[in-house]
Amino acid sequence: MELIFLGTSAGVPTRTRNVTAILLNLQHPTQSGLWLFDCGEGTQHQLLHTAFNPGKLDKIFISHLHGDHLFGLPGLLCSRSMSGIVQPLTIYGPQGIREFVETALRISGSWTDYPLEIVEIGAGEIFDDGLRKVTAYPLEHPLECYGYRIEEHDKPGALNAQALKAAGVPPGPLFQALKAGKTIMLEDGRQINGADYLAAPVPGKALAIFGDTGPCDAALDLAKGVDVMVHEATLDITMEAKANSRGHSSTRQAATLAREAGVGKLIITHVSSRYDDKGCQHLLRECRSIFPATELANDFTVFNV
């Protein structure tokens, strides 16, 4: 999986940072696709500066209904339709997301020429396609807000083709059945169990993408053991009380959570517009003093999961 940050500013855009949007490139050999997490104003324009086609976008996950995470959605939906894209699209989000989308389209005389499904979610598992699952966790914010945990299912281990050939199993369709863990029967009556010729399963990757939040009970479960955790660092340590009073987190709180959850990497985003480039490096240093494996997301930064 690959993360592409389209917007990394909190609340309002700046000259160098747009408001929140994160693209997830699934990069799966049998199922390509793009997922979008939040869609602040101007997201479709940010997408034009990447190599990705909106036609590949098939799922959008909205954390909450504040404008800096949402106001780009109607324009993206309409432009996708005007471009002749017919691939279905599913939007997941909190209560009210359906009313927002339908109202915006209705009063502007707009529509989509592709199937559009809107799923209003609660806490818990919201999606599983057999390759990966997505679970929503409630966060601490003035509006109903969720973070999303994306977990790939474990992949089957490699098939020991050399051992199978030595056992007299001809390559071809039988290998495919054995790779799926099935038992086959050879012409001489012998039974071959695929599980005996498979290496250990390859653990799937796990990713946690937080919406806006102050410290909360669900945060540790959302982030526990993930390879990559994306979390806001809206304000620095000196402004922690102000951040919390508005349902946001400081650098220290993001980094401490990453350490306690045992994540592989922390990526901080959603930084206040009060910070210029020098100020953002200050935020990064504060996080790294607690959790060294921290990176700062800028617009169009790409990270592998």
Swiss-Prot record:
What are the alphabetically sorted keywords of the record? Endonuclease, Exonuclease, Hydrolase, Metal-binding, Nuclease, tRNA processing, Zinc
The protein's name in its UniProt record: Ribonuclease BN
Q: What residues make up the catalytic site?
A: 68 (proton acceptor)
Q: Where does Zn(2+) 1 bind?
A: 64, 66, 141, 212
Classify the source by domain of life.
Bacteria
Q: Which CDD domains does the protein's record reference?
A: RNaseZ_ZiPD-like_MBL-fold
Protein residues bound to Zn(2+) 2: 68-69, 212, 270
Quaternary structure (record): Homodimer.
Would I find Lyase among this entry's keywords?
no
- InterPro entries, A to Z: Metallo-B-lactamas (IPR001279), RibonucZ/Hydroxyglut_hydro (IPR036866), Rnase_BN (IPR013469), RNase_Z/BN (IPR013471)
